[in-house]
Amino acid sequence: MSAPIVETKKASKRRIRRIPDDQRQKVSSACDNCKKRKFKCSGEKPCFECSKKGHDCTYTIIDKRSLRGERMAKLKQKKDNNEKQRELVNEQIAQSSIIHPQITPVLPVPEYANVTYQDSSHSTVSGNDSYHLSSSSSIPQNLPAIVLPDTLRDPNNRGILTPGSTPNSVSSESSVSNVCVPKSLQPLLSFPLENKNNLRHKSEEPDMDNNTNNVPKKGGISNQEGKSAILLVDKSGAFRYMGETSPLSVLYEARGIFYEYVGSTKLTEDLRGCPVTDKPLKITMKEAAPLPHPSERDVYIERFKVNINGAYFVFDMDKFYEEIVDKVYENPNSDLVQENRVLLYFVLAIGSTYKDFSERNPQAEKGAHYFESGRLILRDLVEDSAMWCVLCHYLQFHYYESILKKSTALVHLTAAINYAQSLGLHRNFVNEQFSKLTAEYEYRRKLFRSLYISDRISSVFIGRPLIINDYDWDDPARFKNTNASVLPLDFNSKCHIELTRICTLVGRIVANFYQDKMIDVKKTKNLAIQLRLWSKGLDPELAFGNVLNPSQISNNEDNGNTVILLGIHILHLWAVMLLSRPFFMFEAISKINPEMRKSFEEEEELSKQLCQAATKASILAIKLMNHYINTTFHEIKRMECYVIITCCFYASIILGITILNGTFEEAGYTENDLMNSLKDAQYILSQFSVCNKGAERYSEINLDLISALVNRHKGKEVKPVVDNWSCNLFNDFNFGDTSGQNDVQTMMDFQQFFVSSDLIQFEEITDGTSSLPFDYNNYNLFFGDKL
């Protein structure tokens, strides 16, 4: 007989609450009537519904979700206790850090508190304000501040200081608490100076009215509480970012160095930017503006040719008239010519704008009307990825750059490059399909070279990522000398190829130094060799001497080839500055903090030569641009100046730091020589400042830099500078109509031998990772991520 089957029932497991009961939050609270009728209860006694209908309002079911009020009261009490404990600790630190009244500070001691201005000497943040460079000191300060309690912080302060949010007053209580901080509490990204006597006298701290905010005084340039940020806000308040390769990044570092040497000056305190709204223009027109009379049209097209097409190839001008201008003027309203009509309007807009600039008319209203007309027509067209789309966005890029909308311009440059890549302009085997049509083949290659040049110049000048990858473009002309080309090339095409090769080297410098966070000595030597080899293998027709003698340049009736040749040599000198900049800044900071030098003793001679190369390149670039301004510029009135003003400003900052730390004596020139170069830079920038807000602001900053250098010796005995070098290469070095062959040879020698051959052997040019990488102290503070 089988055993009876017994049914077993699984015992139900009780669900375990993941959150303890005392930490559960209230979801709802309702009386019995509202729960029964599923009405929304106000939770009061009596509730709204019961009061309205006269029911008895009772709460018989109480769960722990209804006890949130008691729990929150306990949490608030706990938070208040923590605040009192924190204030007590700060008070104890303040009492233990009282300084003897006889100690005086050697250098101003900044305190890094992120607080709000009370009485700013500069403009405050507003919609009509110029955008502000939130420029922070890359130089470490002796005594970083203790972080204020949350109750003392401005709730609207988000950590981005502008002149409108920089403090200028101090409370006696908070200032005392910031006098002495142990090393262990110093921020990670700071250079602790070992001079313990650099302490602030308590009696030197100004008192503050009790009714004002208790905020500590801000000294120097803010480092955003340990973050090294290049942050911009344009006139409308839109946020923009400038990266490590931009001149504003160099200015940011220079302000910190000047603060350490000179203290608070207008250079370190005036953080204004350019009053530009960097956004696309709105379309307000209902119909396009009429095309200008042919005679007026030809003037605008000529201005476009001089300012843009000579250096940044866009059109073959003969075909431009034949295929675009003539057809559009025959029947402007035909559906077959609307794409060409858009291109013509954009060309007229650029030409008209630069014509007004040459006449010192910064408004350029006619150019704005033509540009808006082109965009109005473009709005009704379909961008079909044809060649006209590449040209359309490339022309918009040039127009926005002319009115200083750099971020907006870069957006259109990106679109133009994407369309060009979709057409295969970056692939040699695709372009070779047009080999039977030689003109089309060369046009495609030259247009993509222009896009590449614009990418390398514009992206690097504002510190943005490069758009075109070198591995993705297989044009063989980038890696061969111009005289090795199969097809015969005119002078402008040769210059175009060499300009592309220089831009390739600039891209490699950026990739090797400013994308990585490690300086590689072997890569530095490799890039120095490549810069030297470029100069050594340059076609004699394109040599530096021809810039000084435009009459010897072929096909140069309108001086267009002089401009592109000038651009080649200026960018080569700027590439030397860019290559040398990390070493130059390292040497400048090492003067303040000698302990840093111990991290780089093995390659000290290389670093020294690169620093001198940065100074020499800056001097030569300014002299070369000054010669151009005094000669060719007055003849052609070319107002496109992005390369000139950026390199000029970059060079002036390098010379200012050179004067400040006294390294000019080792290089063989006097302070007076460098000051004259700074004055030349001021003259160059002033030529474009009327119609270019960027040049105007650069000019103001350069004046502040000169003023800070001149006034730094006030109250001190100025020691005369003695030049002990037997060969003073750059004294009385001047380019002019009577310049001798020695001056030209000096320039050519520098381009080929800016670093000694004893330190760099040509066999070191092989690729590969270096076995001697080194990391500068606080590298992230200067060249790392700045957000």
Swiss-Prot record:
Q: Known Gene3D superfamilies for this protein?
A: Zn(2)-C6 fungal-type DNA-binding domain (4.10.240.10)
- A GO cellular component entry from the record: nucleus
Q: Which residues bind DNA?
A: 31-57
Q: Cite the Pfam families for this sequence.
A: Fungal_trans, Zn_clus
Q: Looking at the keywords, is Zinc present?
A: yes
Q: What induces it?
A: Induced during biofilm formation.
Q: Which residues form a coiled coil?
A: 69-97
User: GO molecular function: any one?
Assistant: DNA-binding transcription factor activity, RNA polymerase II-specific
Output the GO biological process annotations, alphabetical, semicolon-separated.
Answer: cell adhesion; cellular response to starvation; DNA-templated transcription; filamentous growth; filamentous growth of a population of unicellular organisms in response to biotic stimulus; filamentous growth of a population of unicellular organisms in response to starvation; positive regulation of cell adhesion involved in single-species biofilm formation; positive regulation of cell-substrate adhesion
Q: In what ranges is there compositional bias, type Polar residues?
A: 209-221
- Supply the PANTHER family for this chain: HALOTOLERANCE PROTEIN 9-RELATED, TRANSCRIPTION FACTOR PDR1
Q: Briefly, what is this protein's role? A: Transcription factor involved in yeast cell adherence to silicone substrate, filamentous growth, and biofilm formation.
Q: Indicate what this protein is called per its UniProt record.
A: Filamentous growth regulator 27
